[in-house]
From Swiss-Prot:
Keyword flag Oxidoreductase: no
One Pfam family linked to the record: SASP
Purpose of the protein: May play some important role in either sporulation or the dormant spore.
Organism: Bacillus cereus (strain ATCC 14579 / DSM 31 / CCUG 7414 / JCM 2152 / NBRC 15305 / NCIMB 9373 / NCTC 2599 / NRRL B-3711)
Name used for this protein in its record: Protein SspF
C-alpha cells in the first residue's frame, strides 16, 4: 500500500511548529518525535488558519 499524500506542505508544518514552539524537536527527532498534544495543536491551528482564509474569501 502506498502512503497517502499529506494535506499540509512541509513548509507550512514547519511554520506551525515554529509558531507553536516545538520546531527544535522536529529538527532533532523528525515529525515522529513530537508529542500527540503538539500534533493536535498543530492541526487545530491549521484549521483556524483555513477558516480565516475562507472567511476572507466570502466577504
Amino acid at each position: 500500500m502506498s502512503r497517502r499524500r499529506g494535506v499540509m506542505s512541509n513548509q507550512f508544518k514547519e511554520e506551525l511548529a515554529k509558531e507553536l514552539g516545538f520546531y527544535d524537536v522536529v529538527q532533532k527527532e523528525g515529525w515522529g518525535g513530537i508529542r500527540a498534544k503538539d500534533a493536535g495543536n498543530m492541526v487545530k491551528r491549521a484549521i483556524e488558519i483555513a477558516e480565516q482564509q475562507l472567511m476572507k474569501r466570502n466577504q
